[in-house]
């Protein structure tokens, strides 16, 4: 029997409600509205690693697909479009010590920071402490649209990554030989790298 997302691992089936209360999204929105400065304080206070990698390797969970309209998982075209399930699955994965961290756009990073803060306030352990967090920068190349290869910097800026105390940035470049838009994206990435280096 296929799960809601159209796949299962053996007999295992992830049930979000068994891991994370279904009311969590409302609480995250409430925290954003009632205390706009909370996210920055949480981010700046987060315990970071003394070194990026412990063994020369990194296992990073990618959570930036929905930002460019990629939401399909298995036979469900909108699986990653369900924010509650996305947060439940990502936070569950990040509790595993074999994962070093994640990459995401600002909306997801901020919601995970708030969720981690709420878990700690409730007496639980941090699932983001000493995890590597990478801010995704260019998500403007929306999947399937005419300007997909013109992948503009619609995510984090270099300054925002630095201000939030993130551990690094993620850029994506796809070479499409028949598209001059790829050439523009090369320069977007070069400029972003230079800005990051200058910080």
Predicted regions and their residues:
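Conserved, mostly hydrophobic/aromatic
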Residues: 61
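Proline-centered loop/turn at the N-terminus of a beta-strand
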Residues: 58, 130-134, 199
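Active-site beta->alpha loop and helix N-cap motifs at the rims of alpha/beta catalytic domains
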Residues: 65-68, 77-190
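Short glycine-/small-residue-rich flexible loop motifs, especially phosphate/cofactor-binding loops
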Residues: 49, 158, 194
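An N-cap/entry alpha-helix motif that binds or orients negatively charged groups
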Residues: 2-51, 67-117
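A contiguous, surface-oriented mixed alpha/beta subdomain in the mid-to-C-terminal portion of proteins
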Residues: 180-181, 195-199
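Short boundary motifs at domain starts and secondary-structure transition points
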Residues: 47-53, 123-126
């Amino acid at each position: 029997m296929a799960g809601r997302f159209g796949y299962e691992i053996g007999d295992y089936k992830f049930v979000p409600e068994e891991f994370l209360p279904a009311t969590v999204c409302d609480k995250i929105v409430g925290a954003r509205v009632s205390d706009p400065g909370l996210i920055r304080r949480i981010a700046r206070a987060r315990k970071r690693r003394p070194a990026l990698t412990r063994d020369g390797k990194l296992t990073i969970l990618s959570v930036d697909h929905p930002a460019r309209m990629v939401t399909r998982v298995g036979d469900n075209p909108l699986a990653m479009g369900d924010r509650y399930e996305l947060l439940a699955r990502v936070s569950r994965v990040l509790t595993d010590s074999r994962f070093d961290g994640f990459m995401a756009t600002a909306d997801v990073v901020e919601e995970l920071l708030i969720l981690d803060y709420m878990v700690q306030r409730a007496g639980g352990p941090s699932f983001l402490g000493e995890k590597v967090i990478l801010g995704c920068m260019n998500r403007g190349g929306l999947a399937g649209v005419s300007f997909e290869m013109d992948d503009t910097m619609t995510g984090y800026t270099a300054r925002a990554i630095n201000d939030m105390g993130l551990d690094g940035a993620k850029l994506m470049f796809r070479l499409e030989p028949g598209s001059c838009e790829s050439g523009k994206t090369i320069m977007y990435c070069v400029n972003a790298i230079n800005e990051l280096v200058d910080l």
